[in-house]
């Protein structure tokens, strides 16, 4: 066996070149989940999408890791064709071809999605995706070179936020509209760690770099556009790294435990540089960590476990409870015979009482003179107006809650339809453990949440451990079991029963045990 591991890298464009609108590329089943006003949006490519290939071979183990600028892998059926880019049979078909053409075991192939999702169609057609990836693998294998590898961490805590808002009533909130500030308990944490794999040629020149970070790719294109085909901020960071490291360096991104993590710039809709700012800031933080990493010879090991996760069975009861709440909220709006302000009446009244709470209706001398005379008419007028303002605001709050509930009902119905269509109580999943020196990546076909990512790191006997989410398939969100009763977005947008978590931790522990041997 050679003293040094050998590596090969390559990348190839896989961007959709079709013209048309969202309406042209969405199935009828998918369209019912998309607001009608979006269907006329044109497909526009703002920046290219790539498949990137990293091959590692230490003489006894060979691993092929493919990263793709796409929302998810093999997600058509499970998303009702909303995430239509990657066919259900993409993974088995690709692995079969890799085994046939390159004699590399399919189980040693990992495909990870970046999770960019600005447009409903991102990639070239199914056959072209596989053919181009095979071409990229061939190129990587033809350019294998001895390398040294090091692993380390970067730190970036200023550009992401956990989007789950914990409420004082024990629930979780994510969906718009935003809740009243006085009802908020706090935010869940982020993981600021950036996992960094540094791969150098034997002469010390950069060969490749891999970074792992939790984010959600919701910013849009570097040009400042939303809804266009784009690699989002990941494309900016990868380009930044490649330009700064120079030569023929290829950079790779692996999605972390980012299921509940958003970019903090996501609400800055007027900042057209937000994607560039995010990607550049993250790239700078990666390079800070990269410079501290010491490289050397390493060995690689891979462990693959095939398991089954149970589907949730509580959706019908969940929908029933939400509909009962909707009925009660609707009944609360029945204010027959009561005086109700129109918006035209409400807005000027609200502004008056917000701008000058002490003297809203008249100049202050009128209030002072009324007090001297014992005249309560102005106070009574203010009390009536404040009551009308409160009634109007209460109705808005009620309708906001009804909007959230309708969104939840819609999502839950969609997932129940998927579960019914699949027709089995469980769904298969593949979990991989890839050990590169003292670094271990745990892959998962779900959008893993931050708390689960923290737990995996705590469980690990290895110095550096990272989650590579949305790999080798797609099973939507995977929240901790304790979150289900809190009813947050990731729980609502979830197919899996709470028991998935213990199953996952058990298989991860088994992987760690095998990798230690």
Pin down the residues of each PLM region.
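Non-catalytic substrate/cofactor recognition surfaces at enzyme active-site rims
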Residues: 1-517
């Amino acid at each position: 066996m050679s003293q040094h591991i050998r590596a090969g890298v390559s990348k190839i464009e896989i961007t959709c070149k079709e013209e048309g609108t969202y309406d042209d590329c969405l199935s009828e089943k998918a369209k019912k989940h998309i607001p009608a006003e979006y269907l006329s949006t044109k497909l526009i490519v703002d920046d290219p999408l790539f498949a990137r290939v990293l091959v590692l071979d230490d003489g006894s183990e060979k691993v092929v890791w493919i990263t793709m600028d796409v929302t998810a892998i093999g997600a058509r059926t499970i998303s009702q064709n909303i995430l239509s880019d990657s066919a259900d049979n993409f993974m088995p078909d690709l692995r079969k071809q890799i085994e046939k053409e390159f004699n590399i075991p399919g189980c040693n192939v990992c495909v990870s999605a970046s999770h960019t999702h600005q447009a409903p169609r991102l990639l070239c057609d199914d056959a072209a995706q596989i053919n181009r990836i095979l071409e990229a693998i061939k190129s990587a294998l033809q350019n294998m070179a001895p390398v040294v590898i090091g692993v380390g961490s970067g730190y970036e805590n200023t550009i992401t936020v956990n989007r789950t808002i914990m409420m004082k009533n024990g629930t979780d909130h994510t969906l718009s509209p935003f809740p009243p500030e006085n009802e908020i308990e706090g935010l869940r944490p982020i993981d600021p760690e950036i996992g960094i794999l540094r791969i150098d040629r034997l002469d010390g020149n950069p060969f490749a770099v891999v970074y792992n970070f939790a984010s959600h790719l919701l910013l849009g294109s570097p040009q400042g556009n939303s809804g266009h085909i784009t690699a989002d901020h990941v494309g900016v960071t990868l380009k930044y790294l490649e330009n700064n490291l120079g030569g023929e360096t290829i950079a790779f991104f692996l999605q972390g435990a980012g299921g509940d993590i958003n970019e903090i710039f996501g609400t800055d809709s007027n900042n057209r540089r937000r994607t560039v700012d995010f990607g550049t800031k993250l790239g700078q933080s990666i390079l800070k960590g990269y410079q501290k990493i010491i490289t050397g010879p390493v060995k690689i090991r891979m462990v693959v476990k095939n398991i089954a996760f149970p589907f949730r069975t509580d959706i019908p009861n969940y929908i029933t409870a939400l509909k009962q709440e909707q009925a009660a909220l609707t009944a609360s709006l029945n204010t027959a015979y009561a005086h109700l302000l129109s918006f035209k009446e409400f807005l000027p009244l609200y502004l008056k009482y917000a701008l000058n709470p002490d003297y809203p209706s008249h100049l202050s001398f009128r209030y002072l003179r009324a007090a001297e005379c014992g005249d309560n008419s102005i106070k009574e007028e203010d009390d009536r107006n404040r009551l009308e303002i409160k009634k109007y605001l209460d109705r808005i709050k009620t309708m906001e809650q009804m909007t959230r509930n309708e969104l939840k009902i819609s999502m839950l119905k969609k997932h129940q339809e998927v579960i019914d269509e699949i027709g089995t109580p469980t769904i298969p999943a593949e979990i991989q453990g890839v050990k590169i020196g003292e670094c271990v990546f745990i892959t998962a076909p779900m959008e893993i949440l931050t708390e689960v990512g923290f737990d995996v790191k705590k469980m690990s006997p290895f110095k550096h451990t990272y989650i590579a989410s949305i790999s080798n398939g797609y099973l939507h969100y995977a929240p901790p079991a304790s979150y289900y009763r809190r009813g947050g977005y990731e729980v609502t947008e979830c197919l899996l029963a709470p028991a998935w978590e213990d199953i996952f931790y058990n298989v991860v522990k088994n992987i760690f045990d095998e990798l230690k041997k």
